[in-house]
Amino acid sequence: MVKRVSAPNWSRDGKYFLFNRGGRIYKMAVTNGTPELLDTGTAIKCNNDHGISPDGKWLAISDQTVPGGSRVYLVPIAGGAARQITSNAPSYWHGWSPDGKTLAFCGQRTNEFDIYTIPVDGGAETRLTIATGLDDGPDYSPDGEYIYFNSVRSGLMQIWRMKPDGSEQEQVTTDDYNNWFAHPSPDGKWIVFITFAKDVVGHPANQDVTLRVMSLADKKIRVLAKLFGGQGTIYVPSWSPDSRNVAFVSYQLVYP
């Protein structure tokens, strides 16, 4: 059976992608590349939640090799031993602060999944959201002013944003769909996110989904592609460094 590719990251220099296949992280050149397995030490059951540090030297991964659930680890970008960052589980990485000092992740600590941050050197985690229902997918704006995330608190899953300390939480999208995993562009002008139908619970595979972008200047949304995908299509930051392209996974491209 062919293992599905999912959750592509674009490297900081724009030369290669990192992606998940079968719980392992692979590296592939953007042009005519062949996938190469990245050494992640003992972390060999990776989830789709991973991303490259602003300086391009580290990869944050979410791995569940150790019993008890997913935890966040750091691995050298060239491969090597995985250093555990979060002690509590489950924890799913989603964002680096622009200065590279803080990681944002989704964690379940009671009966709720909420947004947390933690220093890259480890230590105490800080809970940022307390609303009832799932809060997920935190990713920093390139200027560090906001963390974008998705929340079901208003009924459907919608895109929200807040200050990095958790203050000033405000809704960004207000339509009749379920919107997940917003990622700001490197130039700070756009967010890209994946949209599911209003009757779809979670972000399952094998769905008709839409990839959309919002202009942060005027909040107008346009469709990039309609595709058959879902799980793993665009979990993690996947903009090209020049903000002109987005990497994503489609099981079968429908439009355009």
Predicted regions and their residues:
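Sequence signature of WD/YWTD-type beta-propeller architectures
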Residues: M1-P256
